[in-house]
């Protein structure tokens, strides 16, 4: 299913919850642009500035943050599959 949403997934190297989300997306053929806060200081600053906290995984949907791996997966199932 195509989406008209602007999406960005914020992750961190070694984060098990990020891996869970990324595995779900890959298993379902869904590609979302990623920003890794471990290697990209600008991504980390954006995550904090817009989302208000340094928590990953975080899916920005049209500029609004969605936290928690289970919530991100549920949103993807509903809107992207």
Annotate each PLM feature.
Residues 1-30:
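Local sequence-structure signature of Cys/Sec-based thiol-disulfide redox active-site neighborhoods
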Residues 2-3, 45-48:
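Short secondary-structure transition/capping segments
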Residues 16-17, 42, 67:
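Short alpha-helical
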Residues 30-43:
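Thiol-based oxidoreductase modules, predominantly thioredoxin-like and allied folds used
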Residues 48-55:
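Thiol/disulfide oxidoreductase modules built on the thioredoxin-like
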Residues 57-65:
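A short, hydrophobic beta-strand/beta-hairpin element that forms part of a small beta-sheet core
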Residues 69-72:
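Polytopic alpha-helical membrane proteins, predominantly small-molecule transporters/carriers
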Residues 76:
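Hydrophobic "lid"/C-terminal helical patch
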């Amino acid at each position: 299913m195509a989406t008209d949403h602007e999406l960005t997934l914020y992750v961190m190297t070694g984060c098990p919850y990020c891996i869970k989300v990324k595995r779900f997306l890959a298993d379902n053929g869904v590609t979302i642009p990623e920003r890794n806060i471990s290697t990209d200081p600008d991504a980390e600053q954006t995550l904090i500035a817009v989302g208000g906290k340094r928590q990953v995984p975080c899916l920005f949907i049209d500029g609004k943050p969605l936290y928690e791996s289970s919530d991100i997966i549920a949103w993807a199932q509903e809107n992207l599959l």
